[in-house]
Amino acid sequence: MNNIVDTAIEAIVAREILDSRGRPTIEAEVHLLSGAVGLAQVPSGASTGTFEAHELRDKDKSRYGGKGVLKAVHNVNEILAPKLIDLDALNQELIDRTMIALDGSGNKSNLGANAILAVSLAAARAGAESLGIPLYRYLGGPLANLLPVPLMNVINGGAHASNNVDFQEFMIVPVGATSFREALRWGAEVFATLSEVLHDKGLLTGVGDEGGFAPNLESNQVALELLVAAIEKAGYKPGEQVALALDVAASEFYKEGQYVYDGRPHAPTEFIDYLGQLVDQYPIVSIEDGLHEEDWQHWQLLTQKVGSRVQLVGDDLFVTNATRLQKGIQEKAGNAILIKLNQIGSLTETLETIDLGTRNGFRSVISHRSGETEDTTIADLAVATRAGQIKTGSLCRSERVAKYNRLLRIEDELGDRAVYAGAVGLGPK
């Protein structure tokens, strides 16, 4: 015992809590000998990629419709905790590799990616707390000073809303701002103006899972027209000051080799042409999941067609997985990767995937999930990794705004050293 440092793990406790959709998720605390405590909560997705790490649910229909996470909680408290006690919280990789080895599967299906990630993030927070430094500095070192451009999801469709809009997210991107605080204000003003624009047209202003409006619209183009109108009415220049971004989530409407939108099926090449036309007609700077997660051939074609003009982000395509990203790099499919901690299930693997992308000219977009909590880790992660971009929903719902407010505090803390990524943080490298 004499060799145990005060940053050694003394206790780990997990519990079942609720996410922003009222569904169970897991929270973990990591306690160190020094008295430092790290707390982390794990999000959950609605439109999940086939190749994501396994989220363990109880499947006991008598509790939460089978969506409980007591098995994951048990796995933390009874299996992971005993093996992690006395490990140094500052050795993040050892902690994560130990948990991955204990799970023993390729996709964390035995213990659950949600169980492993909760401990992984809580350990990092405990480590930062023990050193008396913020999480972004703990993970990113002295160069962690780049505030990300927010891609703000203000119109929801697809799997994130109960409406007839095909694409999942229509986002505003304040590329022309000079600070994160200014970017956030611009976004909030456009969001408020969009509410007025929708109301004036007799459209619904109820919001979806991520806080964006979810009206029934005639087409995807109508959504884009509404955003341009709101940007202009708020007093900003579309493209120059506030640009647009899309999460197509094409895997959600891919049927038997065709893309079914606007009420009928379309061939992949026809759909690629359609996306190209949208880029021509609107100030779009980023398209996420423009094609199905296994349609590698047409991802190459899409990248050849518009990849020099816009950012093409793989979410379901890459699922924060270094192996799948390596394939994308080799096949020249896309030019950016969406980073979701719970897709891969540990902090170490997440950082490795970001590093692989950076070394190969792929930008990273740090992202929330549709089922979120008040946990703000992704805000710190975006600054720590100098990713330059973050997706954390709309300008309402406190589980979304919590991340924006955390970034405001980080910007204040950095003072004159803070740099806002702006337009340079987006697009193909």
From Swiss-Prot:
Cofactor note: Binds a second Mg(2+) ion via substrate during catalysis.
SMART domains with a match to the protein in the record: Enolase_C, Enolase_N
Protein location: Cytoplasm; Secreted; Cell surface
Any GO molecular function: magnesium ion binding
CDD domains registered for this protein in UniProt: enolase
Gene Ontology annotations of biological process type: glycolytic process
Active-site positions on this chain: E210 (proton donor), K340 (proton acceptor)
Keywords: Cytoplasm, Glycolysis, Lyase, Magnesium, Metal-binding, Secreted
Pfam families for the chain: Enolase_C (PF00113), Enolase_N (PF03952)
Catalytic reaction annotation: (2R)-2-phosphoglycerate = phosphoenolpyruvate + H2O
Disulphide-bridged cysteine pairs: none
Record: residues binding Mg(2+): D247, E288, D315
Cofactor: Mg(2+)
Residues that bind (2R)-2-phosphoglycerate: Q168, K340, R369, S370, K391
PROSITE patterns linked: ENOLASE
GO CC terms, sorted: cell surface; extracellular region; phosphopyruvate hydratase complex
Pathway the protein contributes to: Carbohydrate degradation; glycolysis; pyruvate from D-glyceraldehyde 3-phosphate: step 4/5
UniProt-listed Enzyme Commission number(s): 4.2.1.11
Family designation: Belongs to the enolase family.
HAMAP family named in the record: Enolase
Function in brief: Catalyzes the reversible conversion of 2-phosphoglycerate (2-PG) into phosphoenolpyruvate (PEP). It is essential for the degradation of carbohydrates via glycolysis.
The name this protein goes by in its record: Enolase
Organism expressing this protein natively: Nostoc sp. (strain PCC 7120 / SAG 25.82 / UTEX 2576)
